[in-house]
């Protein structure tokens, strides 16, 4: 298949969100589907209180190398497609911090699309439009709109899946 666009999610694909919650906020991050709303609220409050949280995240293990390999093959087709917390969380600088992180750590030239999670699917333009994301829900929605999803589990698995898609 001809790949027309590759969208990278940021949190837990390129940037180590859980490590950031642990090291920068000093709390154990809840699962992506927390049993307790209070636990989830506590995490978002800690992130809100941590100055420039998203700009201070480290790479996921192997993510920088994975990104560089894909970007070197598709420099004009790679973009970041990352969600920000819902407005009621009060983390107003999240989008600017994510853009700063991308500019500093990846490339000053790569387009950065800042959206709410549920808006990601609006970027699908056809089957050659690939999303690399760690959330199954995002992949399901992306594929339901006609795109191709790669559920992120590791850099190696992502590169393998991308090679399969390329044919």
Task: Give the residues covered by each predicted segment.
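Acidic, Mg2+-coordinating phosphoryl-transfer loop and its flanking beta/alpha structural elements
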Residues: 130-162
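Short, solvent-exposed loop/turn segments at secondary-structure junctions
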Residues: 13-15, 20-21, 84-88, 118-121, ...
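Active-site neighborhood of HAD-like aspartate-dependent phosphohydrolases
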Residues: 1-48, 144, 154
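Conserved Lys-Pro-Asp/Glu-containing loop-to-beta segment of HAD-superfamily phosphomonoesterases
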Residues: 113-140
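Short amphipathic alpha-helix with an adjacent loop that forms part of the alpha/beta core around
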Residues: 122-125, 161-167
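Structural recognition of alpha->loop->beta junctions
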Residues: 98-113
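Substrate-recognition element of Asp-dependent hydrolases with the DxDx(T/V) motif
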Residues: 57-58, 63-95, 102
């Amino acid at each position: 298949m001809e790949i027309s666009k590759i969208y990278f999610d940021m949190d837990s694909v390129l940037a180590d969100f859980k490590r950031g919650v642990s090291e920068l906020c000093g709390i154990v991050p809840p699962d992506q589907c927390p049993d307790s709303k209070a636990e989830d609220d506590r995490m978002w409050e800690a992130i809100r209180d941590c100055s420039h949280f998203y700009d201070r995240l480290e790479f996921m293990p192997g993510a920088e190398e994975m990104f560089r390999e894909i970007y070197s093959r598709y420099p004009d087709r790679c973009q970041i497609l990352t969600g920000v917390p819902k407005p009621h969380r009060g983390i107003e600088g999240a989008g600017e911090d994510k853009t700063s992180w991308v500019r500093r750590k990846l490339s000053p030239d790569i387009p950065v699309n800042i959206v709410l999670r549920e808006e990601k699917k609006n970027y699908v333009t056809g089957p050659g439009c690939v999303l690399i994301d760690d959330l199954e829900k995002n992949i399901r929605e992306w594929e339901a709109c006609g795109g191709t999803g790669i559920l992120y589990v590791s850099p190696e698995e992502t590169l393998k899946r991308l090679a399969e898609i390329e044919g």
